[in-house]
Design a protein with these regions (language model features):
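Extracellular ligand-binding interfaces
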Residues: 465-470, 479-563, 569, 576-607
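Short beta-strand/loop motif that positions the catalytic acidic residue
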Residues: 280, 286-288
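Short beta-strand element of the alpha/beta-hydrolase
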Residues: 83-86, 94-103, 123
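Surface beta-strand/loop "capping" patches
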Residues: 338-381, 393-407, 458-464, 501
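Primarily recognizes the serine-hydrolase "nucleophile elbow" in alpha/beta-hydrolase
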Residues: 194-257
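N-terminal cap/lid segment of alpha/beta-hydrolase-fold proteins
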Residues: 42-92
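Catalytic histidine neighborhood in serine/cysteine hydrolases
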Residues: 307-323
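Cap/lid segment of the alpha/beta-hydrolase catalytic domain
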Residues: 114-189, 241-253
Length: 608
């Protein structure tokens, strides 16, 4: 009898817990939704109480910031709560607001919310990864018996050793069968929708003026949340593209994540961002980098092509991976000013462009709008199907009236990608969180000609017409920089460069009386798997402060793995000069800094 009572109480408890679950578990494979619309059907992000708890509040300079936690839901009988910063301008008004979602390895930031409050926005910055936010506050995100985080390195209560990307069940998943609800992205999208609910319930927020933005993983969360009809605009950063399970044309090994999923069909129709963009009704500003590993360039346009409305823009920082510049960051302010606050920053439309092919030549034209504010129009092209490591060649364009045009040769069994970046003047400089800018950049449509058969080996057969690797005649147009000092390029991946391993780097330097050190870094990351040799470095203290030439053999580069560098397998090449007297890096993005390096060549050196 006693055993019966225990059994009965246990079952009643399980029934009670099951009844309070945010999602009833799917019992069979047949119960599992097969598309994104069905997956979210019936879920109401407002249904459950948020149970908001204010942990701490700061009030300073007309800005209020609160450290809060609120309930995401109940999963496997345990409550999941997320911590966040809620910031708003203390102006007595109902402000436009948006949710910010940080990227992988990152955390919510109090100063980010403070900055956007100075711009007139209320924000909730969700700390989905669970990293510490304040040194004196232990209360934080607690996912309970589920875990969509990145393992114990970041989240002290992690239930798994690392990142769960597949849809298969385990002891910490919602469903006991393969299901999209077992993917970490699903739980993060639930938390994102709950954050929208939190924001719309705040008395300082105008619930009809809500947006969503996020960086990297936060960009993917943005994409999976953008179908929420409460949102009036979204702006994903370096994340949020679809088709992540597919390899690039030419079957670039490792470029797709399909190997992680046992059921790629279920993934592609329920969790991949391509399953969501067709149902996004609000305006989209996609902000990224030309060589981004996470939001691959071509996939951005493939994703935007799924939208059923034309109200979208793309802006990418050139020759950069995972690093938007000030000309991109400012567009978050401009986009939300226009679509959330009802201001009119007059963001031009996507620059109209055309593309045609005839007699072995492709013709590309672009006719940007708002040319009274237009400062520059740059056209870029590439034959490389690997958008993570391709070098975007700057094309010499002809201007006729209001239109720029270029002609580019087409090669058999090689794709061709071409687009334009248009730089505009802002009405006045805008102070960003960390920098200031007086300009912004918008991309045209990317036009792609992809043959039925893509043979990447044909890239090495193209004519070798590039004699000078760099002479800075056009400044750092072909380079990028994170710190405005070291400069990095993908130029080793341009097919017009002779990358024979018998060649050497010839670097002409003019220290102009300074005691300098030269540092070179080369990396193969994000090339196809078979070509990824790892990272290499070279360091040399210049023995003279007079003009000189330095020869660098590929064997001179050091590898922590003991490998030998191959010129054709250099994806990124970084140059740094250090003033040995001050131990400070020379600012190579400046004209003065570039004057120290007269030229860089990759060529065969006789008598060596």
């Amino acid at each position: 009898m006693q055993l019966f009572r225990i059994f009965l109480l246990t079952n009643l408890l399980n029934l009670s817990l099951c009844g309070n679950e945010t999602f009833q578990p799917y019992k069979t494979v047949g119960d599992v939704p097969r598309d994104a619309v069905e997956l979210w059907r019936g879920y109401d992000a407002r249904a459950e109480p948020l149970d908001v708890r204010i942990i701490k509040q700061w009030s300073e300079d007309g800005i209020v910031t609160r450290y809060v936690t609120f309930r995401v839901g109940t999963f496997k009988g345990a409550e999941s709560r997320i911590a966040a910063y809620y910031s708003y301008p203390d102006n007595g008004a109902k402000n436009a607001g948006f949710v910010w979602s940080h990227g992988g390895g990152q955390r919510a930031e109090r100063n980010r919310g403070r900055y956007f409050a100075t711009q007139g926005y209320a924000t909730v910055d969700i700390n989905w990864l669970g990293r510490p936010m304040e040194s004196d506050i232990e209360i934080n995100t607690d996912w309970g018996k589920v875990d969509p985080t990145q393992g114990p390195r970041f989240y002290s209560k992690a239930l798994r050793s690392g990142w769960k990307r597949n849809l298969q069940p385990d002891e910490f998943s919602i469903d006991p069968v393969a299901s999209p609800r077992n993917a970490n992205w699903f739980l993060l999208a639930v938390a994102a929708r709950r954050a929208i609910t939190f924001l719309e319930q705040q008395p300082e927020v105008n619930a009809s003026q809500l947006g969503f933005s996020g960086f990297s993983m936060g960009g993917m969360i943005t994409a999976l949340t953008a179908t929420d009809e409460r949102l009036k605009a979204v702006a994903p950063f370096v994340g949020g593209t679809g088709f992540k399970h597919l390899n690039f044309p030419g079957d670039v090994r490792g470029s797709g994540s399909g190997a992680h999923f046992k059921d790629t069909d279920l993934y592609s129709k329920t969790i991949d961002a391509s399953a969501y963009w067709p149902f996004v009704k609000c305006p989209v500003m996609f902000i990224s980098s030309s060589n981004d590993f996470h939001s691959a360039f071509d996939r951005i346009y493939q994703s935007m092509a799924l939208l059923k409305h034309p109200n979208w823009r793309v802006s990418t920082n050139m020759h950069q991976n995972h690093g938007p510049g000030p000309e991109q960051w400012v567009l978050l302010n401009q986009w939300f000013d226009q679509y959330l606050r009802g201001l009119n920053p007059s963001i031009p439309p996507t620059p109209p462009s055309t593309f045609s092919v005839s007699d072995g030549l492709a013709t590309f034209t672009v006719t940007p709008k708002n040319q009274d504010r237009l400062l520059d129009t740059e056209v870029y092209f590439s034959y490389d199907p690997n958008s993570r490591t391709r070098f975007w060649n700057h094309a010499s364009s002809q201007k006729t009236g209001d239109t720029w045009s270029v002609q580019i040769p087409v090669h058999e069994n090689l794709p061709l990608y071409v687009f334009s970046l248009c730089r505009y003047r802002l009405n006045q400089p805008v102070q960003l969180q960390r920098e200031q800018t007086a300009t912004f950049a918008l991309n045209s449509l990317e036009h792609a000609l992809i043959p039925e058969i893509v043979d990447r080996k044909q890239l090495s057969q193209l004519p070798k017409t590039r004699d000078v690797f760099e002479d800075f005649q056009f400044g750092t147009r072909d380079w990028s920089s994170r710190d405005q000092r070291s400069i990095k390029t993908y130029k080793f991946q341009t097919p017009d460069l002779d990358r024979s391993d018998s060649n050497q780097l010839l670097i002409r330097l003019n220290p102009r009386g300074k005691r300098l050190a030269l540092r070179l870094n080369a990396g193969s990351k994000f090339l196809s798997q078979e070509n990824n040799l790892g990272d290499f470095s070279y360091v040399k203290n210049l023995l003279s402060n007079e003009p000189q030439e330095i020869l660098v053999n590929r064997h001179d580069f050091k590898s922590t793995e003991g490998k030998t560098l191959e010129w054709s397998k250099v994806a990124t090449f970084e140059v740094t000069l250090v003033d040995r007297d001050t131990n400070e890096k020379v600012m190579l993005t400046s004209k003065a800094g570039q004057g120290f390096i007269e030229s860089i060549k990759l060529k065969k050196i006789d008598n060596q």
